[in-house]
Amino acid sequence: MKKLIVIFFLLPLFVQAQLSTKSAGTDLEALAKNIVNQCADIQENEIVFINGDTRDIELLEDIAVNVRKNGAFPLLTVSSDRLTRKMFTEVPEKYDTQLSILNMEVVKMMTTQISVTSGDTPGLLADIPPERFVARNKAQKPVNDLYRESSIKSVQLGNGLYPTKNRAAQFEMPVDQLSKMFWDAINMDYNKLTTIGEKLSKNLTSGNTLKIVHDNGTNLSVKIADCTPYISDGKVSADKPGGAGRFVYLPAGEVFFAPVAGTANGTLVLDQFLFRGKTIKGLKLVFEDGKLTSMEAKSDIETLKDYYDAQDDLLAEFSFVDFGINPKITVPEGSKLYTYIPAGTITLGIGNNFFANGDNNSNASMDFHLAGSTVTVDNTAVIEKGKLIY
């Protein structure tokens, strides 16, 4: 769940796949310089929190050195699958509700956070009761609220595509193909992303109703009048505290916003939905007046329902829309590549929409990727059968 900006300095709850960047043949020093200078725009005397997986230690060190070369101060922490799991299996459950004093103090101190996606085991925490996630998210809420009101910049490398054997297997594509796609997207011309994003944003702000249809049975509409789209183009924008423009997701290439609350109606169908390491087939979600009213699937969804039922009521609210605009990311024929940024993909979400400057303050969020749809603003198509029009 990339979009819920939850600060787990020692323990990322929602784990994504990870590959050593060194094995991908990447110029780590050049990448570190770009992240520090272009994406995060690190200035003298900043305090920069850097975190990632132990297998990416060389990249993390290069980032830290480049931060210091700018006269700023790096604080580096690392994690691993082993640590993530043991923090649940060996730490007593009674501490799930404990406010992290350390996290509060770090948020007060830092000016920028740079994260490299960590984790390498799908379903690593699949056997952990959902109530434990709920308890930890609630305990984390004061930290998140403080983070939201701050002016902390954030750069995250991964964005659901970090190339690994596990993730490539999940997408049913060769890891070399996924790796090339990932790094091509990282290295694309970000000015082009800005141009594409601005054109799409103009179309969105000129209309009143967004409608999404798909041959799989999806037929959903939501009001978007007076909404403010944000462009994720790989650069931190000059923004006020709490502004969505201070978040950078790499590879970049998204336009996202919070729609009008209480206006989503219709059905969203996902041919496949990956949840906690398991694939749910034919997931059908029904929305009425902005709230999720039912979910069913062709395969077992008890794990998903148990997780959903354990959350607060705000998770039921349809709360964000995210368009993929990166033309360097294409969905290969026959693959199951589902993520935010391929041009022509649309992601719809429920629950916390902090990342889009929304008002939903749920302790959780869920997002659903849909490729191959047709999307219109009033009567003007912005996506036609999965192809972004720009």
Predicted regions and their residues:
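Bacterial Sec-dependent N-terminal signal peptides
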Residues: M1-T21
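Active-site bordering "gate/hinge" segments
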Residues: A17-N265
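Short, glycine-/Ser/Thr-/acidic-enriched flexible segments
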Residues: R55-D56, G119-T121, T164, G217, ...
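Short, solvent-exposed amphipathic alpha-helical segments in soluble enzyme
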Residues: A64-K69, C227-P229, A238-D239, K284-V286, ...
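A short, compositionally biased
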Residues: N203-T209, T279-K281, D367-S373
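Oxyanion-binding "anion nests"
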Residues: F247-M295
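Dual-mode signal for accessory low-complexity, basic/Gly-rich regions
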Residues: N265, K278, S294-D359, V375
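Intrinsically disordered terminal and processing segments
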Residues: T347-Y390
